[in-house]
């Protein structure tokens, strides 16, 4: 992939606008998960070390464009950055109306870009306004790289047209390098783990991976559809009957690894309006995939008869992981995902993991140190795996030589 990188730019005395993904959960003014903020700090610190005057922008939540709502304000993020950068970080709320004053060595956080009319529609005028704020634009938000919006793709085009430097920040570059290594230059065997509730939502991912993977491990509702495609009853389990023919086609293209045994629970013990809490008191039962009862729901893969799955992961040279293989939030149905995460950790291969549930499982089972790269992107991660063009990345590549 060919794009300019921030670490190679002369930023001394220049005003640098960094688009980060600071979209973190905030409850009552408190940040409950700071993972994205932690990931953004090295980029901001590097810009400061290079002598830049730093502007940072991001979205938070889904406010109504044109309306200020305090619950979507980035003020808690500004306070967090102040604490972790050991210097004041001012939140600027008037940057769309007047010039922003920032000196080299200082950091100013621009208020939520989604308050601005035209942000989501990639307004030319708003994109130009963002570009006018800076000498150098740094795209560092992989999590929004798949969206053509004013603060992602639009500003890149506007800044480049004005002859300004547009480049990828270290976080975005690392994401793209890791995905490129896993998908375009993988060492073999390449094994993918794809979990989730529906084949239909991951169909493009499965089709793309079937072309390049030596083996694919499927979990969750996706696995149920593949089990049904083998002619087995999945009882009351979540599955998609209309996707069975598609599952059969995918099974002809690559080696789909399925468990021989599963962990089920009686559907009558489950309150679907309070799913996770009701599972805490449900009785786990181990079944062969050939013996699932009509009132039973598959909720995890069983460790017995899954040795071939864990061995495939341990022996892989490249692992791509998106999605747990069971309801790992509940102890009785977490063993499959736990053993799988430990297999990833024990593998000597290069591993990349993406998706909120996947990262939550990695943290729960304390295998962070055993995963080569954890992607901060959700939708962007999936779209890259599907082979789709990420607008912000395409804009960086198109303007690299300009």
Curated annotation (Swiss-Prot):
Entry binding sites for ATP: 202, 329, 355-358
Enzyme Commission designation: 2.7.2.3
Gene3D superfamilies assigned to the protein according to its UniProt record, in alphabetical order: Phosphoglycerate kinase, N-terminal domain (3.40.50.1260)
Cellular localisation: Cytoplasm
Top-level EC class: transferase
InterPro entries: Phosphoglycerate_kinase, Phosphoglycerate_kinase_CS, Phosphoglycerate_kinase_N, Phosphoglycerate_kinase_sf
Binding site for substrate: 21-23, 36, 59-62, 114, 147
Pfam families: PGK (PF00162)
GO biological process, alphabetically ordered: gluconeogenesis; glycolytic process
Keywords of the record: ATP-binding, Cytoplasm, Glycolysis, Kinase, Nucleotide-binding, Transferase
MF-aspect GO terms: ADP binding; ATP binding; phosphoglycerate kinase activity
UniProt keyword annotation of ATP-binding present: yes
Transport is among the record's keywords: no
Metabolic or biological pathway: Carbohydrate degradation; glycolysis; pyruvate from D-glyceraldehyde 3-phosphate: step 2/5
Catalytic activity: (2R)-3-phosphoglycerate + ATP = (2R)-3-phospho-glyceroyl phosphate + ADP
Highest taxon above the source species: Bacteria
Annotated family: Belongs to the phosphoglycerate kinase family.
HAMAP family per record: Phosphoglyc_kinase
Subunit-structure text: Monomer.
Protein name, UniProt field: Phosphoglycerate kinase
Organism of origin: Psychrobacter sp. (strain PRwf-1)
Name of the gene this protein is made from: pgk
């Amino acid at each position: 992939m060919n794009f300019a990188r921030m670490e190679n730019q002369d930023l001394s005395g220049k005003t640098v606008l960094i688009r980060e993904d600071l979209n973190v959960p905030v409850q009552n003014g408190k940040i409950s998960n700071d993972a994205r903020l932690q990931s953004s700090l090295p980029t901001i610190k590097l810009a400061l070390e290079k002598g830049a005057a730093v502007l940072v922008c991001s979205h938070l939540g889904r406010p109504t464009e044109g309306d200020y709502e305090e619950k979507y304000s980035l003020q808690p993020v500004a306070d967090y950055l102040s604490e972790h950068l050991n210097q004041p970080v001012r939140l600027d709320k008037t940057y769309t109306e007047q010039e922003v004053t920032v000196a080299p060595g200082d950091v100013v956080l621009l208020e939520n870009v989604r308050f601005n009319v035209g942000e989501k529609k990639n307004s030319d005028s708003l994109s130009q306004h963002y570009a006018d704020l800076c000498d150098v634009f740094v795209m560092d938000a992989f999590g929004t790289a798949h969206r053509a919006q004013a603060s992602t793709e639009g500003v890149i085009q506007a800044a480049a047209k004005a002859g300004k430097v547009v480049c990828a920040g270290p976080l975005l570059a690392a994401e793209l390098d890791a995905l490129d290594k896993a998908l375009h230059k993988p060492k073999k065997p390449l094994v993918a783990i794809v979990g989730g509730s529906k084949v239909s939502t991951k169909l493009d991912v499965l089709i793309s991976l079937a072309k390049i993977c030596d083996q694919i491990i499927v979990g969750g509702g996706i696995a149920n559809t593949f089990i049904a495609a083998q002619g087995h009853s999945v009882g009351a389990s979540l599955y998609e009957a209309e996707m069975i023919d598609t599952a059969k086609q995918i099974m002809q293209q690559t080696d789909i690894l399925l468990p021989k045994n599963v962990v089920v629970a009686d559907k009558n013990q489950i309150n679907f309006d309070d799913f996770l809490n009701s599972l805490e008191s449900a009785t786990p039962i181990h079944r062969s995939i050939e013996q699932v009862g009509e009132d039973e729901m598959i909720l995890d893969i069983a460790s017995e008869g899954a040795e071939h799955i864990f061995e495939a992961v341990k022996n892989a040279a490249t692992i791509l992981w998106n999605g747990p293989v069971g309801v790992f939030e509940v102890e009785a149905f977490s063993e499959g995902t736990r053993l799988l995460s430990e297999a990833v950790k024990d593998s000597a291969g290069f591993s990349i993991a993406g998706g909120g549930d996947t990262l939550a499982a990695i943290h729960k089972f304390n295998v962070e140190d055993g995963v080569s790269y954890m992607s901060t992107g959700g939708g962007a991660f999936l779209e890259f795996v599907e082979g789709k063009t990420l607008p912000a990345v395409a804009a960086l590549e198109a303007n690299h030589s300009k």
